[in-house]
Amino acid sequence: MSYFKTAILLAGLTALFMGVGYLIGGASGAMIALVVAAATNIFAYWNSDKMVLSMYGAQQVDERSAPDLVRMVAGLAGNAQLPMPKVFIMDNPQPNAFATGRNPENAAVAVTTGLMQSLSREELAGVIAHELAHVKNHDTLLMTVTATIAGAVSMLAQFGMFFGGNRDNNNGGLGVIGSIAMMILAPIAAMLVQMAISRSREYAADDLGARICGQPTWLASALAKIENAAHQVPNYDAERAPATAHMFIINPLTGQGMDNLFATHPSTQNRIAALQQLATTLGIRAPQRAAAPARGLWGGAPRSRGPWG
């Protein structure tokens, strides 16, 4: 995702933010919203990654505390010709992962304990490679800033509902009606802006991630496991912050598996099919059997050789 497209997206969300401000306070409300949006954009550029990591209680690890995981990330980052990102672990039973950061030089990859406990080393490598593909494609800036701005739009919409909109403008009763419509439509509009870029971005990261780790079927197998678990193991942190759902490799929210207008991700079945087609195109045969789960990646598990280092 180019910086130009990022700027267009932020401009659209800023315009939506101003529109909500206008419904609350007329022209002065729109101007205040513009100032707040500009400040939020600047703050989000520099701090949104820290906010998201803190929101999920992610703890940074190094080669002493999580040697196998950090070495795996380092090896795959080398394959992708990327600087070594920071590595974080989230204490969450749902298998999932995301990447964040304003550029490859300031990137971070975060995985849940559930992911590390339920996937094989090969599957985990596929997931990490997918997240590094987001970093290489400069998707991480877009994902984190979008989550911050979309969350702000939703908060402002709720504020407008409680305070009843702008009753003193020339639109008469439209202020109350507008605030109700704003409460319903503004968060949806912000979500649709996120969804507009999410699907193609995930397909691109799947493709590049499979090439980074060297085996598309590893990622395909991981996606199937994560999708199945996401419907059974709730992610309460994500439920409290749905604006961040598009950042994860699989939608962490319950009941969102359909590939429809409001889905944060493409259909997992379609993603798996695309990866299987890529494996066929590259002439790569699927492994005979899956390896054992990658238990103990935060310290002490025996190392096995692989393309991750």
UniProtKB/Swiss-Prot annotation:
BP-aspect Gene Ontology terms:
proteolysis
Sites binding Zn(2+) sit at H130, H134, E202
Describe how the cofactor binds: Binds 1 zinc ion per subunit.
The EC number(s) attached to this protein equal: 3.4.24.-
- Any one GO CC term of the record: plasma membrane
Q: What class of enzyme is it?
A: hydrolase
Bilayer topology reads:
Multi-pass membrane protein
Q: Which InterPro entries match?
A: HtpX_protease, Pept_M48_protease_HtpX, Peptidase_M48
Where is this chain's protein located in or outside the cell? Cell inner membrane
List each coiled-coil range: none
**Active site (record annotation):** E131
Which residues are connected by disulfide bridges in this protein? none
Keywords for the protein's UniProt record, in alphabetical order: Cell inner membrane, Cell membrane, Hydrolase, Membrane, Metal-binding, Metalloprotease, Protease, Transmembrane, Transmembrane helix, Zinc
Is Protease one of the keywords?
A: yes
- A molecular-function term among this protein's GO annotations: metalloendopeptidase activity
Which Pfam families does this entry report, sorted A to Z?
Answer: Peptidase_M48 (PF01435)
This protein's major location comes to membrane
Q: Does the keyword Translocase apply?
A: no
| Homology family | Belongs to the peptidase M48B family.
This chain belongs to which protein, by name? Protease HtpX homolog
Q: Which organism is it from?
A: Rhodopseudomonas palustris (strain BisA53)
